[in-house]
Swiss-Prot record:
Gene: EIF4A3B
Source organism per UniProt: Oryza sativa subsp. japonica (Rice)
InterPro entries given in the database record: DEAD/DEAH_box_helicase_dom, Helicase_ATP-bd, Helicase_C-like, P-loop_NTPase, RNA-helicase_DEAD-box_CS, RNA_helicase_DEAD_Q_motif
Binding site for ATP: A75, Q76, S77, G78, T79, G80, K81, T82
Catalytic activity: ATP + H2O = ADP + phosphate + H(+)
Name listed for the protein in its UniProt record: Eukaryotic initiation factor 4A-III homolog B
Length: 404
């Protein structure tokens, strides 16, 4: 395993060769960026960004995408999905043509903005123009940018749909549609908006779905707008997040969760921690309660103005804040390297979300710890999660701080 023995581990060197892919016959595994047929100035950007070696999903998915095939790619959180999307799109786009040629839809503003950032960094030497079309930002800015001309739009379904209907986002040159975090996009209320967007796109369209989990009902939906897709799938049993130790703390009643969190606070601040609640109201309540007990925490959820969300994300990314309380808006693919502890103050409402949340705590094979607060009535959900991911969640040991 070359990645394991590399002395200088860039963000792109990963110990994930042991993932088992259930992949369409004939999909090549290409173990270096140089062998992918990528243009020279794009390769410069990839290496400048710090990548050394493609991850397992990049080794398999980039070539089919840049060859024009429809693709369903499944990769667990932290395996380099965003950079795989960015790399493929940068290769496909003709930067001499100042029109939108690729559209990437994401379920959250933060993920759409992150995709824009990574693409601009990787595509620095090809002068790619990318715009994040997301709610909470000025519509005037969207109109100005789109009329000036961009090659790629990375956005959320609502705002993208709005821009298309206003005829500000012209779709005639779009040749590639990518749905990132497709399980969330199609399975949780975004379905209608995606179909709305899809109706405006040219008939000769390449479609790619990328996600950490692909439940059966999602795969059924893909038949409606994909032609003979290449499948690149991780076996579900392999989706346990390697290197992440998972624990639970039994709490008799809801109020005890707060005391447990306070007891753990010193452990949290050893590194950086994310605490997940199921509702925005709970995030606000917990944040206020922690602060009134003199604990330093920051908070983020979907009701906050975009500017405030950006500022909070920036502080957390830079390490200025160490404990972030949030809802599942944060669980979808955001890349903060230092996070090695996740606490599920509330267990997630569905088992697919579990992997998105705890995937946050060990990106690219980094070790991590996930702690679940579990009431008596939650035991069933916890057992269901264990069974679904073929994993074991043990009671939290006293020396949990030593594991982080």
């Amino acid at each position: 395993m070359a990645a394991a023995t590399t002395s200088r581990r860039g963000p792109g060197a990963m110990d994930d060769e042991n993932l088992t892919f259930e992949t369409s016959p004939g999909v090549e595994v290409i173990s270096s960026f140089d062998q992918m047929g990528i243009r020279e100035d794009l390769l410069r950007g990839i290496y400048a960004y710090g990548f050394e070696k493609p991850s397992a999903i990049q080794q398999r998915a980039v070539l089919p995408i840049i060859s024009g095939r429809d693709v369903i790619a499944q990769a667990q959180s932290g395996t380099g999905k965003t950079s795989m999307i960015s790399l493929s799109v940068c290769q496909i786009v003709d930067t001499a043509v100042r029109e939108v040629q690729a559209l990437i839809l994401s379920p959250t503003r933060e993920l759409a903005a992150q995709t824009e950032r990574v693409m601009l960094a990787i595509g620095d030497y090809i002068n790619i123009q990318v715009h994040a079309c997301i709610g909470g930002k000025s519509i005037g800015e969207d109109i100005r940018k789109l009329e000036h001309g961009v090659h790629v739009v990375s956005g959320t379904p609502g705002r993208v749909c709005d821009m298309i209907k206003r005829r500000t986002l012209r779709t005639r040159a779009i040749k590639l549609l990518i749905l990132d975090e497709a399980d969330e996009m199609l399975g949780r209320g975004f379905k209608d908006q995606i179909y709305d967007v899809y109706r405006y796109l040219p008939p000769e369209l390449q479609v790619c779905l990328i996600s950490a989990t692909l439940p059966h009902e999602i795969l059924e939906m893909t038949s409606k707008f994909m032609t003979d897709p290449v499948r690149i799938l991780v076996k579900r049993d392999e989706l346990t997040l390697e290197g992440i130790k998972q624990f639970f703390v039994a709490v008799e009643k809801e109020e005890w969760k707060f005391d447990t969190l306070c007891d753990l606070y010193d452990t949290l601040t050893i590194t950086q921690a994310v605490i997940f609640c199921n509702t925005k109201r709970k995030v606000d309540w917990l944040t206020e309660r922690m602060r009134s007990n003199n604990f330093t925490v920051s908070a983020m959820h979907g009701d906050m103005p975009q500017k405030e969300r950006d500022a909070i994300m920036g502080e957390f990314r830079s390490g200025a804040t160490r404990v972030l309380i949030t809802t599942d808006v944060w669980a979808r693919g955001l890349d903060v390297q230092q996070v090695s502890l996740v606490i599920n103050y509330d267990l997630p409402n569905n088992r697919e979300l579990y992997i998105h949340r705890i995937g946050r705590s060990g990106r690219f094979g980094r070790k991590g710890v996930a702690i679940n607060f579990v009431k008596k009535e939650d035991i069933r959900i916890l057992r269901d999660i264990e069974q679904y991911y073929s994993t074991q969640i043990d009671e939290m040991p006293m020396n949990v701080a030593d594991l982080i």
